[in-house]
Amino acid sequence: MIRTQLELFPQKIKKGQRTKKIIIRKSSSNYFKDWNESLAFMARNFNPGDRKYYGGMIDGDGSFNTYLPTKRKGIKLMVGLELRHDHAEPLLKLAELFDLTISKKVYLIPKGNTQPSLSVEFSGIKAKLFLFSIYPYLLEKKEKATKVLLQMGCPEQYLLKERQFSFEYLAGYTDSEGTVCFSLQHHVRPQRPTYSSYHMYYQLTSNDGGHLQFIKKSLIDLGFNHFRKDQKRTYEHVKKREGVDYNTNPQTWKPTSVLRLGGTPAQLSKFYEQLEPFILIKHKKENMLHTMKYNHIINIR
């Protein structure tokens, strides 16, 4: 458990400081300028399944941007990923694949139920290799990636625009923006016996409704046609938070599309059989396995 701010940093908290970063893993290969054997090994080790998975992960929680360094010539590319510290299995794997430095961000001032996070940021030829490798599998951020890679000098003929679906991609997006629910609920009824039942569903959210509709159509084409009614969350009744230094104005927020796959335990289990092998975050994988186990138990003859 993270200790209080005074226990962690008794003499180093600056006025107005809300967070502190701690390096917990240091890269041994930060300054590659040209192609070399270490990069070739990383490229070979970054297999197609991993590339598809991180296409989904970056579409959800990842970021990539170009910038102009103040003391160096030419445009530079920066790729970043930040995940909650206890849901960070994808980030840890990525750090191993590309030998990245991992930072841990802790909140010095308690802020609701906000948890510490882990993050990686990498630039240069590593970032270019990574983005070019996942480019064919990006969906939501493909247009942005096209512009960035063209800026970085990638030949346009290698940047194919068609979109493709895979369960590896969906696993990455699920670990980023998905909910896998398997919970026991107790129902209290007036003058009637209380009963309990399991609540289970699979859900994705995105500010890009077209992206979710592409995923939905792809799953329907594969036979998973047990979606619930699409939802859209709006924020016109959310009040703006004052006194903070980041954008919390609900008037600027895009509506959030919600895609939920329901159905029977058997239907969800059939879907999870395809998806679960590629999931990395432990609690989401466990909820899928619990659903499949429950379905097996209730169907024992």
PLM regions with names:
Residues 1-301:
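Internal intein/HINT superfamily modules and their associated LAGLIDADG
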